[in-house]
Amino acid sequence: MAWRQLRKRALDAAIILGGGGLLFTSYLTATGDDHFYAEYLMPALQRLLDPESAHRLAVRVISLGLLPRATFQDSNMLEVRVLGHKFRNPVGIAAGFDKHGEAVDGLYKLGFGFVEVGSVTPQPQEGNPRPRVFRLPEDQAVINRYGFNSHGLSAVEHRLRARQQKQTQLTTDGLPLGINLGKNKTSVDAAADYVEGVRILGPLADYLVVNVSSPNTAGLRSLQGKTELRRLLSKVLQERDALKGPQKPAVLVKIAPDLTAQDKEDIASVARELGIDGLIITNTTVSRPVGLQGALRSETGGLSGKPLRDLSTQTIREMYALTQGTIPIIGVGGVSSGQDALEKIQAGASLVQLYTALTFLGPPVVARVKRELEALLKERGFNTVTDAIGVDHRR
């Protein structure tokens, strides 16, 4: 048995190193090979590496530019204008993948229409003890309890400032940058942490995200309460408005899927009252839907991936209705196909994000979502993504 396991690991390594070399020189220089990644390379990586090590390797490979530029050409049909910017396509990488701003340019090369860095906390912090990430391959899902591990504002500012001129051009070309802000675990004044994030990283962002919905920092989700949220966002908006320069970042709030009806009404009310620029819906869920098969399904943390998809989409639908479609929404949670993306768009999202799908399907999933989304838009008689936004509410 030991010999068989050793031989299997050696074979996995050969696939990753040898197959990866072939991949770099041929497959991805064309259109990417969905089957090769989903059936061979990604499973081999998962057998060889624990989830966090695989994540770190992926960030490293992408940051070094080792993956060739995706060749899928975004059509005008996929372009969206929202949050004061043009988005070449509506598919972004969600916060949590590039926590420290190390792989922004490599992620654009994969075909994402926008990149969201973070969450970033004011001071560096380690997050929760390992292991803190768990795969549920049977469910196409992941549970994480990272706990806002972050290099801190100073380190991320240094990295992003070094490429600021490049980002200015990318944004002009329809590839905006978002930065997701968090609070330190030991901070007493949460608002002060977010305000500091706005002050330091605001000048480098096209949009900022106030993340008050991670389930892995004690007390964080309580900031979604009406009084606490109004107080926090008032200070964040005041700091944003005080930033120098003509182009100030949009401010969005990322909310949880595990909210009561009253919670949702309160968030919608505060967002409209204060003029929040957008909502990101949703973060991971602490619930465990019936039917999960993964052996690690009972691990503590936030669940992402396919089991989150419908809960996320329903929350988008409800928040779009509560805000009467006046506040742009970025939909995230279980997106791995064009159908998933379109369902969120028709429910009210202007843009979508993915992350967990990369774990199981690899980089070709980006082109797959865009290709399938474009085909579905044509099939259903939409001329653009914008035409499909919130259409479920007009039927």
From Swiss-Prot:
Its EC number is 1.3.5.2. Pathway: Pyrimidine metabolism; UMP biosynthesis via de novo pathway; orotate from (S)-dihydroorotate (quinone route): step 1/1. It is found in: Mitochondrion inner membrane. It is an enzyme of class 1 (oxidoreductase). It holds the Pfam family DHO_dh. Residues 31-395 are mitochondrial intermembrane. GO terms for molecular function: dihydroorotase activity; dihydroorotate dehydrogenase (quinone) activity; dihydroorotate dehydrogenase activity. It catalyses: (S)-dihydroorotate + a quinone = orotate + a quinol. Binds 1 FMN per subunit. It is a single-pass membrane protein. Residues 1-10 form a transit peptide. Its main location: mitochondrion. The active site is at residue 214. Monomer. Belongs to the dihydroorotate dehydrogenase family. Type 2 subfamily. This is Dihydroorotate dehydrogenase (quinone), mitochondrial.
